[in-house]
């Protein structure tokens, strides 16, 4: 019996609950709840409160700065993109001024050219006759030089041809006279026909000379030579 009691006591002690605060009830009053305290001393509790407060405040500050910095970066990035797009779409002020100046110059250039072209045309039209009038006088000098050259060139062979014609006519006349005296009437008729051909040839030569040198007919020297040639041919015909 004694052993049974001792074993029951030893086994019953661990089964008992440790001393501590009573569990909260649904119907517990606020006064009873507020009167209870956290376990531990008051100093350790203050340190715990400080550590928790500092960590929470640091976390909040870090998150706040991170969010604000992210927003600022995004806003800066957006503004940079907007400025770049504006710069690409719109040229700077210096280029705008240059473009405006170039456009004004291009618009003024046709007007200036048109205004300058009209006086130039009006001035060139009256100047043209003056230039022609100034250049026209040398033409008579050239014309005078050309006839003089033609006269000189044509006058040189003229005396030789006239002399040859006169010599031929005199020879023909002497031969015909001698033949006429020696031969009979038939030969005289033949000689007369030959003289007619020579006479026809001599005026033909004179006509050819006149046609070849139209300018010589105007000069006095050419007229004298032609008169002498014609006189020689007439004398030959008269002798015949």
Curated annotation (Swiss-Prot):
Transmembrane segments: 46-64
GO cellular component terms given for this protein: axon cytoplasm; mitochondrial inner membrane; mitochondrial outer membrane; mitochondrion
Residue intervals on the Mitochondrial intermembrane side: 65-240
Keywords linked to the UniProt accession: Membrane, Mitochondrion, Mitochondrion inner membrane, Mitochondrion outer membrane, Transmembrane, Transmembrane helix
Membrane topology: Single-pass type IV membrane protein
Quaternary structure and interacting proteins, as annotated: Interacts with RHOT1/Miro-1, RHOT2/Miro-2, TRAK1/OIP106 and TRAK2/GRIF1.
Function: Plays a role in the trafficking of mitochondria along microtubules. Regulates the kinesin-mediated axonal transport of mitochondria to nerve terminals along microtubules during hypoxia. Participates in the translocation of TRAK2/GRIF1 from the cytoplasm to the mitochondrion. Also plays a role in steroidogenesis through maintenance of mitochondrial abundance and morphology. Plays an inhibitory role during neocortex development by regulating mitochondrial morphology, distribution and motility in neocortical neurons.
Name assigned to this protein: Protein MGARP
Protein species of origin: Bos taurus
